[in-house]
Amino acid sequence: RGSQVQDAGLTHLKACLHEDPENKLCIRAHKQLRKIDKALQKARGFSDNSKWTAVVSALKGAKVGGPTIYDEIQQVILDAVSSGILPKTIKNPADQSELLHEIETLYCRAYVEQEMINKAMPWCDKLGAVDPRNEHVFVAKGEEQMNQGNYEEAVRLFSQASEVSQSLS
């Protein structure tokens, strides 16, 4: 799903470059999107193989202490709106970004699988705001409740995660 949206973005940028090969905004956005796509492909591959530490590492970006892939996508969106590549009529484009939601899912799941609930919760909360029925959000919240000793609430959340998971199967 995320790659379909990204492919649409690449198609739009390629059309922009075709119309004006010297358009610096389109050139820069195209290079950034290719770099982001490469990092996301790595993260998806690690996720498919349940290599959760590697998922987080791939999403952190190439430079230590530099912007994460998530930060880079947010910046690309802001730049695209301010430069007119994306129409200003789109309300809160970052909130509608399939790529950002995919990254939130990857971070949430990777941290939950590593039992790093404190690191998972900010990502799972962002994801839950967009997709409140996401199974990984329920699992994260269940783990958080377990850690706080709220066992009945944890069981309820784990049951909801199971229901969502079964409905997707």
Task: Spell out what each predicted region is.
Residues T11-K14, K60, D125, S159:
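Alpha-solenoid helical repeat scaffolds
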Residues D20-P21, P67-T68, E98, P132, ...:
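Short coil turns that delineate tetratricopeptide repeat
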Residues A15-H18, V64, G128-A129, S162-E163:
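Conserved structural position within tetratricopeptide repeats
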Residues L25, D37, E102, H136, ...:
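Start-of-helix register in tetratricopeptide repeats
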Residues S3-Q4, S50, E115, G149:
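Residue-level detector of the short coil/turn that links helix A to helix B
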